[in-house]
Amino acid sequence: MPNRKKVVLATRNQGKVKEFNRLFAEAGWEGISLAEFDGVPEVVEDKDTFEGNALKKAIEISTYLNMPALGDDSGLEVDALEGRPGVYSARFAGEDATDEQNWRKLLKELEEVSTQERTARFRCTLALVIPGEEPIVSTGACEGVIAREPKGTNGFGYDPVFYIPSMDKMMAELMPEEKNQISHRARAMQQLLEIIK
């Protein structure tokens, strides 16, 4: 059996955990959900960049558990909104907002914006912290357009309103295997794996 690397996923977001575990399986790694550990303090995402939040999560979790940890911060950058919601993507409609509340607020803010000006990207920054080593940071992006109506039932977050012209589908219409080829998280993971080879 090949040597498998164990890494704590510094997130409680189950959508991200599932996606990371599919990506980890391809690389021979094992991602351990933060939910499997009792008493781990919540990491406050108070940085103003994806990299700052990803590093903070990975460093704090790795230090607390004395294990390798992978921090992720990702979000949606909408050009017509000057990059918003950005690092506030998960809280766009409020601190405890649901995914649907967030994308509904986004659609409302873009009501008067033409289709050509609804360009956006999902961006992901990963930070891998291994005790005693320098952090490794990678980024990935997936370009698209914000649709006017939601479509699809796969995925999470803003996936139902994120249209990918090159695939002629919404992110939420992609099967996991398709998403793992083109998503911002998959691209950041591929870059990370290249760095640590």
Give residue ranges: language-model regions:
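Anionic-ligand binding patches
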Residues: 2-8, 14-33, 37-197
